[in-house]
């Protein structure tokens, strides 16, 4: 790990851009060490901007962790997306203080709005070819920012969606 860290360089931006490749090196090491058999499944929980195999948009442009995983494991790599319709989310403010903020209401043309029309509070749905188009979806990172919704082709990025209609920071 120290060798990989040294290869990432000393500059903050360099290290930030290379973090997904370092995530992959660490994940591959652990998978090869503990889950090499094909019948063993591995679950890796990560941010949607990292786990998808397409792009880190709208964050800092870099090759996402998911692209390295897809190249190494092919279609066996199945990234899943977690979305929340409404409620509170924990993130940091500009001074790195932890804050619970209310999520903005999903716009009518967003995936969260569409999924909120379903009666269940928590459910999973696969992303079929019917979703092969640009649609707005929430991207919440480590910091609260005013813009929460961005256009994505979720079908190309994820195999399915776990949706939570409403939550606060302590209850689902």
Where are the predicted features?
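Catalytic core of tubulin tyrosine ligase-like
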Residues: 47
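A charged, amphipathic alpha-helical module
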Residues: 1-40
